[in-house]
Amino acid sequence: MTDLNPTARAAGLRALLHRYNHEYYVLDAPSVPDAEYDRLFRELEALEAAHPELASADSPTRRVGGAPLAAFASVTHRLPMLSLNNVFSDMQDSDPAGRHAELAAFDQRVRDGLGLDEVEYAVEPKFDGLAVSLVYEHGVLVQGATRGDGETGENVTENLRTVRSIPLRLENAPGDDLFAPAVVPARLEVRGEVLMLKRDFERLNSEQDAAGLKRFANPRNAAAGSLRQLDSRITASRRLTFFAYAVAEADGVSLPATHSATMDWLAGLGLPVSRQRSVVRGLAGLTGAYEAMLAQRAGLPFDIDGVVYKVNRLSEQARLGFVSRAPRFAVAHKFPAEEALTVVEDITVQVGRTGAITPVARLQPVFVGGVTVTNATLHNEDEVRRKDVHVGDTVIVRRAGDVIPEVVSVLAERRPPQARAFEMPLVCPVCGSHIVREADEAVARCSGGLYCSAQHKQALQHFASRKALDVEGLGEKLVDQLVDAGLVHTPADLFALDQPALARLERMGDKSAENLVRALDACRHTTLARFVYALGIRNVGEATARDLARHFGTLDALMAADQDMLMTAPDVGPIVARSIVDFFAEAHNREVVDALLAAGVSWPVVETVTSAGVAGVSGKTFVLTGTLPTLGRDDAKARIEAAGGKVTGSVSKKTHYVVAGEAAGSKLDKAHELGITVLDEAALLALLAGNA
C-alpha cells in the first residue's frame, strides 16, 4: 500500500486496471504479468470493502458479478436494432456472374439508388453471436441491452459489465499503432456482438463434462445462454467477448464521414472493433473480400457465418435509408452452409399450424454446422419427387442459412435394393381428416381445421408467441399439456383457465399456475397490430399486421374490407389480400375472434393516418435530438406519428423538421447545414395543434 488517501488510491487503481484490461483483452498486448493485475485488483477490492462510498459503476470490481436478479427488465431501444437482409452465393456455379448473382443485385440496387457507377463499401466479418446495445453517458457504461425483437430488448447491464473486453469507462484514449485517439461524447450508443471465442467454448464444454452437465452445441448458443443468466456471476465465469460494429447515437460530437473511420474512432475510445475489416470498391471488391474472408474463416479465433458489407460513406447511407426492418445500404453475405452425408431412415409428415403437410426426412444423427441433426425438411411432395429421395438413401444434408437442416441431394449410386419411395398419405396422421392439395399450390393441407390437435397446438403457440400476444410462461410443452388434457381448443379458451385447473397439470404447481393466470390476464390488453398477427392469418407477418392496423384503425373495418380495399394498405398485394378475405369469410374464424373479444381482449383505439392527419405534420419527416422540456422522446414520436408524420433517426435532405431540445448534438448542426427548419418543443406542440 502507498501513503495516498483511500480516494486517490482507489482512483489510481481503477485507472491502472482499466488500462491493463484494455491492453490484455482488446489490444492483446499486456504490459504487466497476470499476477500484478491480480494483486492490484485485490487491493482495489479491499479498499472498496473498507470504504463502500468509494465503489463506482465503472469500477473493475463490478466485473465479477452481483446478486441474482428475479427477471430482466425490458428496454425500449431509442432507435430500433434492425436486422440485415441476407444474400447467398452458389459456390457450385462455375460461372462467377451466376455464383454471386444475389450480391450483384444488391450492388446494382445501391448504385441505382445513389446514381453512381461504383460504390465504396466497408467490409466486416458477420459475427455469429448475440447483438447488443451499449449506452455510455459521459464515458460511463450506464446500460446494456439485448436486441430482442428490434424494438424492445432485455436489460442485461450487470451481465455486460462482466465482459472484460467491454470498457466500463471510455477514455480520451491515446490510441495504438492502428487507431487514432478520440473524444468521449456526452451520450454514446454503440451496437455490437457478444460472442465466445473458440478456445473459451472448448474450455466451457470441458467444465460441463467434468460437472456431468450437458455440453453446449456451439459457441453462439453458449454465448447467448451465458449473457442471459439471471445470476451475473455465472456470466462472469463464462469469458465472453465483444466487438463493436455500429454507432446508433453520438451526442455532442461530429462523427467521421465514413463507417470505416467511425470504427477507428470507436477503437480510439477503447472499444474493441474487428481487425478483419477492409474498404473495397465495386462488385469486384466485394467478391474478392468474400473469398478472402471465407478462406480465413477456419483460422479465426471466433465463429463467423458470413461477411457484412456497408456503404462506407455515412451521407450515402442516409440517402439510401431503410426498407421495412432492414437498411438498404447494408447486407449480410452468408457463407455456404456446412454439409455432411447421412442416411434417410424414414420419411414422415408433420402438420403445421395452418394445416400445411410437410414431408420430413428422419436421419441417422449427423453433426452439421455445430449441431447434431436428426431431421431435415423436404419442403413438399414435389420437392421429394424432384430430388428423388427414398427411405434408405444416402443424402447430403445442409443447414440452409445455418439454421434449417435440409436434404440437398441424393447419392443415387449408394441406393440399397430395399429403398422405398415416398407416398403422401391420404389422411392427416394427427386427426384422420383428408389431406387435400389445391391445383395451383405446392403445399398439401389437412382439411381438419381447428379440429386437428396439431393445428390447435401450433396455432396456440403462435398466438402466445413474443411478437403476438406474448404470453409469458406459455411454451410448447405447456400448450401440448393443455390441448392433450382437453382444457384448451381455441385461443379464447386460454382466458377461461384458472389456477386450480392449471395446478393439476404435471410439473405446474400452484405458483407457476398463478403466474400463468396473471400473464394471461395481462395479455388481454394488447394492440390491434399484435392481435391481427396473433390470429395466424396466412401470409400476414408482423410488419403487415402493423400496416393493416395503422391503415384501417379498427378490427371491424379490417374484417369488412374486400380485396380491393385491402390492397390500398401499404405492401398488401393480391395474395395477402386474398388470404385475409378468406380468413374472415370462414365463420369459425369469426367465432374465435368474437370469443376473444368476449373474453376481454382489447386494445387502444388506433387512429389512421388519414383520420388523424394534421396540416403541416401529415406526410412530413421529423428528426428528434436532445432532451425536450416536458415531452419524452417516445411521447413526442407517438404524437407526431398520430398526426400523420414520420420520425426517423438521421437528418437528410428528405427531413422536413428537426425538433431540438437541450444538449442537441450533431443532428442540429446537420439541420443548419442543410437549411432544415428547427423546432423547439413549443413550436412542435403548436404545429401538432394545427396552429403553425
From Swiss-Prot:
Any transmembrane segments, and where?
none
Quick one: a GO cellular component term? cytosol
Q: Does the keyword Magnesium apply?
A: yes
Q: Which CDD domains match?
A: BRCT_DNA_ligase_like (cd17748), LIGANc (cd00114)
UniProt-annotated binding residues for Zn(2+): 428, 431, 446, 452
Q: Which GO terms describe its biological process?
A: DNA repair; DNA replication
Family classification? Belongs to the NAD-dependent DNA ligase family. LigA subfamily.
User: Cross-referenced NCBIfam families, in alphabetical order?
Assistant: dnlj, PRK07956.1
Q: What does this protein do?
A: DNA ligase that catalyzes the formation of phosphodiester linkages between 5'-phosphoryl and 3'-hydroxyl groups in double-stranded DNA using NAD as a coenzyme and as the energy source for the reaction. It is essential for DNA replication and repair of damaged DNA.
Q: What is this protein called?
A: DNA ligase
This chain's source organism reads: Laribacter hongkongensis (strain HLHK9)
Which gene carries the instructions for this protein? ligA
